[in-house]
Amino acid sequence: RRRQRQMCIRDRDLSGNLAAGTSTGGMTNKKWNRIGDAPIIGAGTYANNATCAISATGWGEFFIRSVVAHDISALMEYKGLSIQEAAYEVIHNKVAKLGGDGGVVGIDRNGNVTMEMNTPGMYRAKMDALGNLIVKIYQNE
């Protein structure tokens, strides 16, 4: 199985509104009529001004079954977890236990960013309020 690159975008505007967008190149040798997690709101993409904006990349079937993006938001809203705690819980203790791999990029209503993954690497970047760009590939960076 070889995955194509996926573009995940999440943003917070000056008024505090959150947005998420996810685009995918799909999966090589995918099954005919397969729909991945990217176009499914709550699985691969989700935004809620009260909590966070999340975009996901990974093995879509597991992200759909786990409703990854919405689940992170729900853990923040109902359990009071931080975006980092919620993302870790979903990616490592839900998706991974089902056999799925991948990660998420997200931003919460306060501008805190998560880039959580259960894979050795995931192309990701963020820009801070001063315009400094931070680009990472491997998990230990």
Task: Enumerate the predicted regions with their spans.
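Conserved mixed alpha/beta catalytic, RNA-binding, or beta-rich assembly cores of soluble enzyme
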Residues: 24-65, 73-79
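Short beta-strand scaffold segments in enzyme catalytic cores
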Residues: 9-12, 18-20, 102-107, 111-115, ...
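Short, well-structured alpha-helical segments that form the helix of a local strand-helix-strand
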Residues: 82-96
